[in-house]
Amino acid sequence: MKRLVLLVVLVLAAGCGNPLAGGGEGGATGDIIIGASDVGESLLLAQIYAGALRDAGAANVTVRPPVGSREVVVKALQDKSLSVVPDYSGNLLRYFDKDTTATKPQDVYAQLRQKLPAGFEVLDQAPAEDKDLLVVGPQLAASGVKTFSDLGPRCRELVFGGPGQWSSRWKDKIKALYGCEFKEIRTTDTGGPVTVAALKSGDVQVADLFSTSSTIAANGFVPLVDDKNMFPAQNIVPLVARGTLSPAETAALNRVSAALTTEQLTRLNVEFTEEKRNPLDIAEDFLARNHLKS
């Protein structure tokens, strides 16, 4: 998902040290170690999980970013040096089943639960998603381009900007589903400032951003409706090392998931990236606002 530069204060607030050192058997019998990636959103979610778990009675909860690649995370959950990590349903499913064709939220979640190896579990998924979007400028949207199907016949006149791997993963699929063949596909970055600048300047007319990106509304960009579900669902879901959380702790994280919407997650990202708020304060405010603190 979208890459953010982690400020030093973020790491200090979350706790220092080797994220995969120590650990133990987790919350059901000991410490709970929450992993977070080198993405601001992941750290915010980890701090929200930590606050909810502490409120549920967990005595020793630590957030230790960054934990590295998904392969590293999976290994750490297997040996229980990590207890739980916030993740994304579609990406997790594709990791465990590279041949999956599921795209809708409930289909992705159901298949993910089926494909998880022994020793893992996913808790309830949140309504919140941070998934790929195709976005356009207001002029193109005003000309009648509101959906991917609207975009299809216009693609030959439009330049697209997105990450380097976009062509290998999506070029053939968008052609098959929507008849879309872009005039040119330019490599920008993964939903970051290079992509935003290219769309603002008109160097590209269509771009891949993420659904919780604060830059969409800030720049007047218009997200298109993926009316045939090309991009898979990416609901926020806790990935847990089985046996590391008590029933009360599991219930606490499920309550967090039930409360977390895409709109709220977008707002959390704005508070972090644009307002430069401390992630601990953001997490505490989220929990209080959603009545998740006793």
Question: For each predicted feature, which ranges?
Answer:
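Ligand-binding "clamshell"
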Residues: 96-123, 203-206, 215-228
